Amino acid sequence: MREREYATFLFAIYSGYAFKMTQLTVARQVMAHRGRRLEYFTIVWNGLEGLIAVAAGIVAGSISLVGFGMDSFIEVTSGATLLWRMSVDADVESRERNEKLSLKIVGACFVALAVYIAYESVSDLIRKRSPEHSIPGIVLACVSLIVMPILSRAKKKVGNALGSAAMKADARQTDFCVYLSTILLAGLLLKAVLGWWWADPIAALIMVPIIAKEGIDGIKTRTCC
């Protein structure tokens, strides 16, 4: 009788543990699916944003708008990388391998972005170039300031739930898109209202070391999940 009770007790414990593990697995799959949807949205949004910004920049002769568009294309690369990572979340070994590679790719995107912004900012200062008046550029920057913070918070939530350093790094990159949108908007408005041609390149240069540090940290990171 005691053996039967003991066996029943062990079975109950095992069943409860198995049920709990199943719940955790299902919850993780749900968050991974949410992460994939966020990355799909990131790719589509930034692709359109990049095309509009580059087109508006060429029409207005604005280097800042063109640079902003290039940043959006880098965000597309980051989003595609994280989408790849999310697609193998159920496979532990593949997840770990892709996590490391994702961190390095996202880090490389940060570094590339920092180099590009530094180059364009210095060029603007030397040549005394400034953003031209662009209504599409101002509208685009305003919309980006609404969408990007919401997207960043959603990515951070998924990154924390999955323990994904790559997703958190991508969320930080989305934050930088918010900063760049602010800089773009401020540059366009200050030039249009006050004629301060140097405001945009100086503000962009302030961001360069921060972006570069994030990129280097991402490339050097060894731990994941």
Language-model features, listed with the residues they occupy:
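N-terminal amphipathic/basic-hydrophobic helices that include classical n-h-c signal peptides
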Residues: 1-20
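Alpha-helical transmembrane cores and adjacent cytosolic helix/loop segments
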Residues: 14-225
